Design a protein with these regions (language model features):
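Membrane-helix boundary/juxtamembrane motif in polytopic membrane proteins
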Residues: 102-108, 133-139, 155-176
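Extracellular-loop-to-transmembrane junctions of the mid-late helices
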Residues: 127-153
């Protein structure tokens, strides 16, 4: 029963998020913020597919232990696409609040993203192993958590400063996103 429920949920989620993202990109009519959100949705769905499709196959067949390498590879790809997702979210912030300059801040965002991706690429992660080291999971998540904290603070401060009713809870959605992602 678990296999059917999880697989069904994952399929609906992947189809929905990728299609919504594609529709947003196609219908953005020059609105760069809208295009960025659409791109984020496609990247999120595509990245998650690398983890969720092997997960669903494993659940519906011989079990997770027989798909260790595929699941590890999916987790690796998802780690990188989530990093790109948050870099794009930074650009949503820049567009929404018409931020110009701030090259130091942009350098920090790209530096944290590069550090995260570099750490994800290290063989010590043992992505394809049945028992990857917890320490490397922590190391690679440090720059990611800092990137997330930075984006959270930017949205919180800007929404408050601009009295942006539509985005007043954006910071909280990012916190929840991290809360759901980090255990994975």
């Amino acid at each position: 029963m678990r296999a059917i429920a999880e697989t069904g949920f994952d399929a609906i989620y992947l189809i929905a998020v990728i299609n919504i993202g594609i529709l947003m990109i196609r219908r953005c009519e020059g609105n760069q913020q809208y295009r960025l959100f659409g791109s984020m949705a496609v990247i999120l769905g595509a990245g998650d597919a690398f983890h969720l499709v092997p997960w669903a196959v494993a659940l519906c067949t011989t079990g997770l232990e027989d798909y260790t390498a595929a699941l590890g590879l999916g987790k690796w790809i998802t780690s990188i696409t989530m990093t790109v997702f948050y870099v794009l979210l930074y650009y949503v912030w820049r567009k929404r609040y018409q931020v110009t300059g701030r090259s130091g801040l942009t350098a920090a965002v790209f530096g944290l993203a590069a550090a995260r991706i570099f750490l994800c690429m290290m063989s010590q992660n043992q992505w394809l192993s049945a028992d990857p080291p917890l320490s490397w999971g922590i190391y690679r998540n440090i720059p990611f958590a800092l990137l997330g904290l930075l984006v959270i603070l930017l949205f919180y401060q800007s929404a408050k400063e601009h009295k942006d009713h539509a985005f007043r809870w954006m910071w909280l959605t990012i916190v929840l996103s991290f809360g759901f992602y980090l255990p994975v």
